[in-house]
């Protein structure tokens, strides 16, 4: 049974959300690398010391913002997967990649916060919410490869040589694969994500602004298809 919050608890939760929203707004104006309590307090009509009643320090606020961003990205990608035929692995890859790119273009500051330039001086807590949120968001990609393996349609990747270190890392850090995804395919999955992330960054940060929208879209889909074929994902 859900316990109702007291009035004070509701007010505190609302203020926490307002602080985070103001911080996101400032990041949209001045970037993600210079988040300061003084600026947030000024926007909210508060004194900087008052913010410490809600967040222990700037890093605690950044941790919440990063975790929120990963969760939002994960939800967007998961929703895209759910709208596809679960047996159409190629279609799922295009849908996942497109959702990833669309979110990055729409939320470029949040994208930069979690997958762009590190914020100077910030170190994520070792076992904090950012690690779990990031893992959950990126699990959408590994689930796609696991599904392909379950269906028996995961093909050998273009590059099949994999180091012992990479194979050990796959087994240790991603036990959810349960041996279904061989090391060479795990490596190909990381390479496919790197390709998706690379072209998304170029697009989100204006490097393709000289292209028409149609040309950008065609290039993006073509790149996803190329990376799928290299990774052993069946695609039409």
What kind of region is each of these model predictions?
Residues 115-122:
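Short linear capping/connector segments at secondary-structure termini
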Residues 15-23, 40, 65-69, 73, ...:
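Generic hydrophobic, amphipathic alpha-helix propensity
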Residues 18, 26, 30-60, 64:
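Helix-turn-helix
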Residues 123-129:
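Flexible, glycine-rich active-site loops centered on histidine and acidic residues
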Residues 1-14, 235-236:
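N-terminal intrinsically disordered/low-complexity leader segments
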Residues 64, 80-110, 131-140:
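Hydrophobic alpha-helical connector segments
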Residues 139-236:
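C-terminal peripheral helix-coil segments that are non-catalytic and often amphipathic
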Residues 22-29, 72-83, 195-202:
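Solvent-exposed, amphipathic alpha-helical segments
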């Amino acid at each position: 049974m859900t316990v109702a919050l007291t009035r004070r608890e509701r007010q505190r939760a609302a203020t926490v959300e307002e602080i985070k929203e103001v911080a996101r707004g400032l990041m949209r104006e001045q970037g993600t690398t210079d988040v300061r309590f003084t600026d947030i307090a000024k926007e909210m009509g508060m004194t900087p010391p008052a913010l410490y009643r809600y967040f222990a320090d700037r890093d605690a606020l950044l941790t919440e913002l990063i975790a929120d961003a990963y969760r939002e990205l994960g939800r967007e990608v998961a929703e895209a997967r759910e709208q596809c035929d679960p047996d159409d692995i190629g279609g799922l890859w295009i849908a996942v990649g497109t959702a990833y790119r669309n979110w990055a273009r729409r939320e470029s500051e949040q994208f930069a916060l979690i997958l762009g330039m590190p914020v100077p001086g910030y170190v994520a807590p070792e076992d904090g919410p950012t690690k779990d949120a990031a893992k959950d968001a990126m699990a959408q990609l590994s689930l796609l490869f696991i599904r392909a393996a379950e269906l028996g349609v995961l093909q050998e990747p273009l590059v099949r040589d994999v180091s012992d270190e990479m194979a050990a890392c796959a087994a240790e850090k991603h036990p959810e694969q349960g041996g279904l995804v061989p090391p060479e395919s795990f490596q190909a999955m990381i390479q496919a994500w790197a390709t998706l992330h690379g072209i998304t960054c170029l697009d989100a940060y204006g490097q393709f602004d000289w292209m028409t929208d149609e040309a950008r879209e065609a290039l993006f889909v073509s790149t996803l298809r190329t990376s799928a074929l290299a990774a052993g994902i069946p695609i039409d």
